[in-house]
């Protein structure tokens, strides 16, 4: 077994326990984690880069950044001689070995500094707190109002047309929606150039996946938050074969299940075209396949934790088609652009050629995906708008 600790010193000790022969490489790695922890997302706003002493302090980290930026996880894990440690380092972000090593080290660095982690209540609770603050400041939210088209008048974005026929006029339009849908559907592909076409035709997306969620009347208190293990019997999902399982155990989050119960999830490889076509052409088989996969996952977990199968009270299976229907995300991807050496070295524009008063934010302009990318890129756009209006950007804490 191998435990990934958020504290770099504990992580180093664990890595040395597993692979003492990789001691030199391990100590270099954990030293870089500590160096990178000085460069947290809000570092620029603390003034660290403005002071000579602060800038000199992060020079070693900047040099290391270049090294990791051009290296993917597949290459990074080969630095370790121990086969098990090499395998484990390649699994921290699932099976996505094209992921840049820079993203791996930064994530561990922010966790070491306790500037990143899991929000209790999950993403919904996280975004609910943002919405609450937005409403306090006078904002409005329109639910069940999907945008069909972005209204363009005289070369500027002037509002949005909803799929229910409604129209909302605006001085500025900011899209946090799916990038492909925004550019090629909502704007009908009228505002793009060769660079944008190249990005959307060649950049790697996060893969489409299946998510199996389970609620069990079994207490997993004290168990690891996540475990990854090989399968004796592979699970076939469409044309994808899964020979390992990464199981997320939410016993640490008491909001996810009643007392004495636990919520668990796992992700499986899933082909978008297969599941989308199956849902359209044979809904009965689509539903049957979801039930079969859920049953096989439960059976697999039961072998790991005897009695689990009988304790499961609720299941939910989301296919790539589900992701696309609920989120509109292109090709059912569970996030946006994958953080690869290529995407990390490319500046993705947040504006479109020939269109004024329009901006894009989120995971299609900042590789890596997730809610933080929406907040970080959104904040930068608001700063730009404040500058255009001659207003100083300030943050008022509630």
Predicted regions, residues:
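A conserved FAD-binding loop/helix module that cradles the flavin
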Residues: 363-386
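Active-site-proximal substrate-binding core of FAD-dependent oxidoreductases
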Residues: 152, 386-398
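Active-site/ligand-binding neighborhood in enzyme catalytic cores
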Residues: 34-137, 144, 326-341
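Feature captures the FAD/FMN-dependent oxidoreductase FAD-binding
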Residues: 3-4, 11-12, 36-37, 135-136, ...
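C-terminal segments that line or cap access tunnels to active or ligand-binding sites in enzymes
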Residues: 217-321
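A glycine-rich dinucleotide-binding beta-alpha-beta segment and adjacent secondary-structure elements
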Residues: 83-96, 303-367
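Mid-domain catalytic core of redox enzymes
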Residues: 148-259
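Dinucleotide-binding Rossmann-like beta1-alpha1 core, especially the glycine-rich loop
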Residues: 1-35, 61-62
